Amino acid sequence: MSVKSILTEPNKLLRQISKPVENVGDEERRLMDDMLDTMYAAPGIGLAAIQIGVPKRIIVMDISRDEDKKEPRYFVNPVIKNKNDITSKYEEGCLSVPDQFAEIERPNECEVEYLDYNGKKQLLKADGLLATCIQHEMDHLEGVLFIDYLSKLKKSMIIKKLSKIKSNRIIV
């Protein structure tokens, strides 16, 4: 298991649509382990495979917020089967959009079908932060970032700021 580099906006790979996983095998489990290590090291509560440059429909998350009681979740080929009409707002951030946060409104409940770490089909009814995190990470699988829900002006300002930060980096 190893910590990988996280891609940051602007990066064309982040706008790519991820491809379904044919089979959950050792390679996919190693990827999920690396994703989880990367997410914890960042630190964050969710990560999509595309954020480390792998265009597969895989997301990992852990919303437990307790260092001693980690509760990792693995979603392969997740599909939202149902969403609630009632929405809630959470201030979202993203490891691929560093140090930027915005209040985003999403359905406060969703039902998601997916394959787990071992390739077994699962159905989960999620609400609150878990539902928000699932929807946020699943957006990555479609090439969508949380900043895409903002006004054009706000989004443009964030991208300019991130581009400037990237161009000022010195790699030694």
Swiss-Prot record:
Q: Which residues bind Fe cation?
A: 94, 136, 140
Q: What is its EC number?
A: 3.5.1.88
One GO BP:
co-translational protein modification
Q: Provide the active-site residues from the annotation.
A: 137
Swiss-Prot/TrEMBL catalytic activity? N-terminal N-formyl-L-methionyl-[peptide] + H2O = N-terminal L-methionyl-[peptide] + formate
> Which UniProt keyword terms apply here?
Hydrolase, Iron, Metal-binding, Protein biosynthesis
InterPro entries, A to Z? Peptide_deformylase, Peptide_deformylase_sf
Q: Does the keyword Hydrolase apply?
A: yes
Which cofactors does it use?
Fe(2+)
In alphabetical order, the GO MF annotations are: metal ion binding; peptide deformylase activity
A Pfam match: Pep_deformylase
- Tell me the cofactor note: Binds 1 Fe(2+) ion.
Q: Which HAMAP family match?
A: Pep_deformylase
Protein's UniProt name? Peptide deformylase
**Which species is this UniProt entry from?**
Pelagibacter ubique (strain HTCC1062)
- Provide the taxonomic classification: Bacteria, Pseudomonadati, Pseudomonadota, Alphaproteobacteria, Candidatus Pelagibacterales
